[in-house]
């Protein structure tokens, strides 16, 4: 009887260790399976309102997708999710607020893609921190300094900022790396040069041989 109890305790201990390892692995991989969405409103020089839809990945703060419209609807928003994640690349979880823009057509498309929606609490933007932080950076580092004439000009500006954010903008949480990781360049590679980005609002620095 005593030996049976010892054997049972050993089995329980092994199972607990395995469960702990699985939980740690799942928690480590969770950010790779979460994306967040949100809208921001941009006013043109003629006071026309344009709505920008953004998709941001929790893993390495990737800026995944954007588009612009003057008339946001559930069908249009659902189409953006399909364009952002083609060919079975959909995430597991989609975090967004309770805006009525996310209507029945949106819910249906997301469910068809196998994505689980996670809704923030009412009036709780801090629960969607990654998307809110990205939108804040986009305003402070880009849109607050540029006059927007129309939808096409806004798309051009956003394209350059998304490229800058993905390839060059550093983050403390990424140990001063960019979302698309950059290799450390040694002094032997040459002198440091600056490459203007986002119309000269920002710069990327690289080493190039003379």
Range-by-range predicted roles:
Residues 1-210:
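Charged DNA-binding/catalytic regions of mobile-element recombinases
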């Amino acid at each position: 009887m005593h030996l049976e109890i010892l054997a049972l305790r050993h089995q329980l201990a092994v199972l607990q260790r395995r469960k702990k390892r699985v939980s740690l692995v799942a928690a480590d991989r969770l950010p790779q399976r979460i994306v967040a969405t949100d809208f921001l409103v941009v006013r043109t020089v003629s006071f026309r309102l344009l709505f920008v839809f953004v998709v941001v990945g929790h893993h390495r703060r990737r800026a995944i997708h954007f588009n612009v419209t003057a008339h946001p609807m559930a069908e249009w928003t659902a189409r953006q999710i399909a364009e952002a994640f083609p060919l079975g690349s959909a995430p597991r979880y989609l975090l967004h607020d309770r805006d009525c823009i996310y209507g029945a057509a949106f819910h249906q498309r997301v469910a068809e893609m196998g994505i689980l929606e996670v809704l923030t609490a009412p009036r709780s933007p801090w629960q969607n921190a990654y998307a809110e932080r990205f939108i804040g950076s986009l305003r402070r580092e880009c849109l607050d300094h540029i006059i927007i004439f129309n939808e096409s000009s806004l798309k051009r500006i956003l394209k350059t900022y998304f490229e800058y954010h993905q390839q060059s903008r550093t983050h403390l949480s990424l140990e001063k790396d960019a979302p698309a990781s950059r290799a450390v360049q040694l002094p032997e590679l040459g002198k440091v040069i600056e490459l203007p980005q986002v119309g000269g609002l920002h710069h990327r620095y690289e080493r190039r041989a003379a």
